[in-house]
Regions:
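Charged, low-complexity intrinsically disordered terminal segments
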Residues: 1-238
Length: 238
């Protein structure tokens, strides 16, 4: 696409891409792709070592967005039917919410490249693509996570029928746990799917299980996905 004249911009996290074959990046750059690594390690900024880019987004022409948990690696090549192929989900968005995704990408882009990407090529006029309202929330080490956390808590507190949560790394704080318990106690059906035996973080799995007791006692149903690593991050309320 870059050779054909399409403007292609790629951000990869410095730590997350530390094992990538540099020849692949060179090949992309030679074709005209602009590739930037997010927050490389430098001695004078060690306190920002944990400022990482964990977003997985693809925005096309500023009009179509894909967002979810899947990255660009062999784990996502198959159909989640083998241990080396992870189970995940991606979602396609159209309409004004895509501009919010684009803004999230460009926020990180300016931090790596210091060059603003603007104009109709990146922010075209977007009309509603349907009748379902959509809102994109974002978090970052600098901005914090309170917006996303607050929306999760409000949705859980507002639930009347059901809460279905998929989480690859589930170690909730006490307030979130209490909200789930109160939802179950008022009759909301709460179901949680987590990774099973096949996980990429045994430490997180053990920490997660330490949080299960009060949830199970309140009637929350917890399931472990068995076929392969479960990498979903998703919650559906009512």
């Amino acid at each position: 696409k870059a050779r054909g004249g399409v403007k292609v911009h790629v951000i990869i996290d410095w730590i997350g891409s530390r094992n990538i074959n540099s020849a692949l990046l060179d090949q992309m750059r030679e074709a005209g792709v602009e590739v930037e690594r997010y927050n490389p390690l430098v001695w004078y900024a060690l306190t920002r070592l944990n400022h990482r880019d964990h977003r997985k987004m693809l925005i096309v022409d500023g009009r179509v967005g894909f967002i979810g948990g899947a990255g660009l690696a062999d784990f996502w090549q198959g159909n989640a039917d083998a241990p080396q192929h992870w189970r995940d989900a991606m979602f396609k968005l159209e309409g004004p919410a895509v501009a919010q995704m684009q803004a999230a990408f460009l926020d990180n882009w300016t931090k790596t490249n210091a060059r603003v990407l603007d104009g109709d090529d990146y922010f075209p006029e977007l009309r509603p693509a349907g009748d379902i309202p959509a809102q994109v929330f974002r978090s970052s080490p600098r901005e914090g996570t309170e917006d996303i956390r607050l929306m999760y808590l409000l949705c859980i507190a507002a639930a009347r029928k059901s809460i279905r949560l998929s989480a690859s790394y589930y170690v909730p704080d006490d307030l979130t746990t209490q909200e789930f318990i109160e939802a179950a106690e008022r009759g909301v059906k709460v179901e949680i799917i987590l990774p099973g035996a096949k996980t990429d973080s045994g430490i997180v799995k053990h920490a997660s299980r330490g949080k299960w007791g009060p949830l199970l006692k309140a009637g929350v149903k917890i399931y472990e996905y068995q076929p392969t690593m479960y990498h979903h991050k998703m919650m559906v309320v009512d």
